Amino acid sequence: MWQAISRLLSEQLGEGEIELRNELPGGEVHAAWHLRYAGHDFFVKCDERELLPGFTAEADQLELLSRSKTVTVPKVWAVGADRDYSFLVMDYLPPRPLDAHSAFILGQQIARLHQWSDQPQFGLDFDNSLSTTPQPNTWQRRWSTFFAEQRIGWQLELAAEKGIAFGNIDAIVEHIQQRLASHQPQPSLLHGDLWSGNCALGPDGPYIFDPACYWGDRECDLAMLPLHTEQPPQIYDGYQSVSPLPADFLERQPVYQLYTLLNRARLFGGQHLVIAQQSLDRLLAA
């Protein structure tokens, strides 16, 4: 794998050699390395060869976010595979937690991301993943249909495959669709998994990574913030300073949070199952 990475980097940086190769802690999904090649520092994700499509999708999402010129993301240098492993090579940006100032700036940047481009439908040109969960993105013109079927219904079906039952799937999907039936927002490009673990302060300001992008309701990104108390509230303030949210945003917030809560429940079980069921019960009773 390292020979393949060196070859791809040499095509862009000229001949060099690997000067540093340190495995990083916390690689819960993929192995992660800090690599120095020809004086440049890189962050390398690697896994089994069969997982190359996931790395390709991540690279495509980072490129899409970069193309908006609104947010900072790690530059992708290489994505590929050898006989045994697949890999994704990006800029290495030593992460620090966001402070109040950088959180405010990030909030402004996210607001501008949501204003970028003019997309008439909801979805994405390819499917991707939320953490390790496959995420479908088939294009759909009605937001209520997209979110009810491809977000909530999808999570409920995946949970059922693991023997986790939250109720009648068809009835829940219908309820969610009705809750959103009168809400048809302008599609915005979303990061899709905007929590504190995917935001950091780098050498040149805040940056985001590990996206789960799709074109959706901008409120979905903002609905994530209250689920993570460690996320500085100034992100929300910065966002509001550029693109104020509608007054009825809080009515839809628990609907959008349910997607993340169901995903956690299926992945981690335990108390997450209780939290997701309680959230769903409150929505169905409203």
UniProtKB/Swiss-Prot annotation:
GO molecular function: ATP binding; kinase activity
Gene3D superfamilies per record: 3.90.1200.10, Phosphorylase Kinase, domain 1
Active site: D193 (proton acceptor)
Binding site for ATP: D91, Y92, L93
Keyword rRNA-binding belongs to the record: no
Top-level EC class as recorded in UniProt: transferase
Domain of life: Bacteria
Listed EC numbers: 2.7.1.-
SUPFAM superfamilies tied to this protein: Protein kinase-like (PK-like) (SSF56112)
Transmembrane segments: none
Keywords: ATP-binding, Kinase, Nucleotide-binding, Transferase
Pfam family, one: Fructosamin_kin
Family: Belongs to the fructosamine kinase family.
Functional summary from the UniProt entry: Ketoamine kinase that phosphorylates ketoamines on the third carbon of the sugar moiety to generate ketoamine 3-phosphate.
Protein name: Probable ketoamine kinase YniA
Species of provenance: Escherichia coli O157:H7
